[in-house]
């Protein structure tokens, strides 16, 4: 479960010396560290540090990681995993963000028409627009937010030119 997070908290004297490390379990799995308890010894933890795990019951077993990441690990161009330096491995972990998918001309035209009619959508109208254009409600909501910011910027630039 990608919602499970490991949180390492170093207990220090001042608020500046206090540090916390958060990582996504998918990143740990990608780095080959999910089932390896030795990775903890490589982190900069003192004797007064403690490790807390949120949602321990929801943590998937190690087999689930290897199944889920089998397709991700298929590319042969990733750097080799160094078990002595897990922090460096996290730098090469892949993002879980979806790829950018530009809107079609039809979708953009319909969204622009809707925006000209009304800059703000009700929940019901957002649902309708999303259904008609085969988009998610979240995509429609964010498109409208971005479009309003674009209009604000255009108006600001126009006022500056005058």
From Swiss-Prot:
Keyword Phosphoprotein among record annotations: no
Domain of life of the native organism: Eukaryota
Keywords: Cytoplasm, Developmental protein, DNA-binding, Homeobox, Nucleus, Transcription, Transcription regulation
Key word Cytoplasm present: yes
Subcellular location: Nucleus; Cytoplasm
Pfam family for this entry, one: Homeodomain
Broad class of where this protein is predominantly found: nucleus
Entry's Gene Ontology BP terms: anterior/posterior pattern specification; embryonic skeletal system morphogenesis; negative regulation of myeloid cell differentiation; proximal/distal pattern formation
Residues of the DNA-binding region: 96-155
GO CC annotations on file: cytoplasm; nucleus
InterPro entries associated with the record: Abd-B_homeobox_TF, HD, HD_metazoa, Homeobox_CS, Homeodomain-like_sf
Xref: Gene3D superfamilies: Homeodomain-like
CDD domains xref list: homeodomain
A single MF term (Gene Ontology): RNA polymerase II cis-regulatory region sequence-specific DNA binding
Annotated function: Sequence-specific transcription factor which is part of a developmental regulatory system that provides cells with specific positional identities on the anterior-posterior axis. Required for induction of SELE/E-selectin and VCAM1 on the endothelial cell surface at sites of inflammation. Positively regulates EIF4E-mediated mRNA nuclear export and also increases the translation efficiency of ODC mRNA in the cytoplasm by competing with factors which repress EIF4E activity such as PRH.
Quaternary organization: Transiently interacts with PRMT5 in TNF-alpha stimulated endothelial cells. Interacts with EIF4E.
The family this protein is said to belong to: Belongs to the Abd-B homeobox family.
Listed name of the protein: Homeobox protein Hox-A9
Species: Cavia porcellus (Guinea pig)
């Amino acid at each position: 479960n990608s919602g499970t997070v490991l949180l390492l908290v170093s207990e220090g004297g001042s608020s500046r010396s206090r540090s916390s490390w958060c990582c996504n379990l998918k990143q740990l799995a990608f780095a080959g560290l999910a089932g390896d308890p030795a990775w903890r010894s490589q982190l900069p933890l003192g004797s007064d540090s403690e490790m807390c795990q949120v949602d321990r019951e929801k943590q998937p077993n190690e087999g689930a990681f290897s199944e889920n990441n089998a397709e991700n690990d298929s590319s042969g161009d990733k750097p080799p995993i160094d078990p002595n330096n897990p922090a460096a491995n996290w730098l090469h972990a892949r993002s879980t963000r979806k790829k950018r998918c530009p809107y079609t001309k039809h979708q953009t035209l319909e969204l622009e028409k809707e925006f000209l009619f009304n800059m703000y959508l009700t929940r019901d109208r957002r649902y309708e627009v999303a259904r008609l254009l085969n988009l998610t409600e979240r995509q429609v909501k964010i498109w409208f937010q971005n479009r309003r910011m674009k209009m604000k910027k255009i108006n600001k630039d126009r006022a500056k030119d005058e």
